[in-house]
Regions:
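A generic secondary-structure micro-motif detector
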Residues: 40-41, 96, 119
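C-terminal "cap" of GNAT-fold acetyltransferases
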Residues: 52, 60-61, 116-139, 143-169
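Conserved glycine-rich acetyl-CoA-binding loop
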Residues: 68, 86, 90-104, 111-113, ...
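Generic detector of contiguous secondary-structure segments
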Residues: 13-19, 98, 115-117
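Acetyl-CoA-dependent GNAT
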Residues: 3, 7, 12, 16-86, ...
Length: 169
């Protein structure tokens, strides 16, 4: 993604994260996931990430509103395909459609990169996430333990149409 995408629904703009956003992204993630700490009995993995490394090594896009970072999505390609590694929405923006918009952005990025599916995972006790992902077309395909985390893996087929390799004469 290049540049800024102004005029998004909800009055925010999307742009690539930069190194100078590290502290703001870390603070956003801490705020977005804080309510899960008691529920799952530990810090969710996104709260333990080093965001200077994440911003350097992955595609991180932030959503800004009035100059403040209120959302972020972390994307990467893995052996399984195009991964939405993290979606974080500031508590003040929950219920505004920002999370869904970040997921739609991620899906568009996957299509642009030539992928016909996108996958993600979430803790099994993050039931709001599971419900949202199911509502918008994600289907559970696996459950795995990763350390102390019981994770639900979900995938969404994007219905990409691949260009034909034949040419007309």
């Amino acid at each position: 993604m290049t540049g800024t995408a102004p005029h998004q629904p909800g009055g925010y703009s999307l742009r690539p994260a930069t190194r100078s956003d590290t502290a703001s992204v870390a603070a956003l993630v801490a705020a977005a996931y804080a309510h899960y700490v008691e529920r799952i009995g530990m810090l969710p993995r996104p709260m333990t990430d080093d965001y200077s490394t994440v911003i350097r090594d992955r595609q991180v896009t932030v959503a800004e509103h009035d100059g403040a970072i209120v959302g972020a999505v972390v994307l990467t390609v893995t052996d399984e395909g195009f991964l939405i590694d993290n979606v974080a929405v500031h508590p003040s923006r929950r219920g505004t459609g920002l999370g869904r918009a970040l997921l739609q952005f991620a899906e568009a990025e996957a299509r642009r990169a030539g992928f016909d599916a996108v996958h993600l995972y979430t803790h099994e006790r993050m039931t709001e996430n599971l419900a949202l992902y199911s509502r918008i077309g994600y289907v559970e395909y696996d459950r795995r333990w990763q350390g102390a985390f019981s994770l639900v893996y979900m995938r969404k087929q994007l219905g990409c149409v691949r260009p034909s390799s034949s040419t007309s004469n």
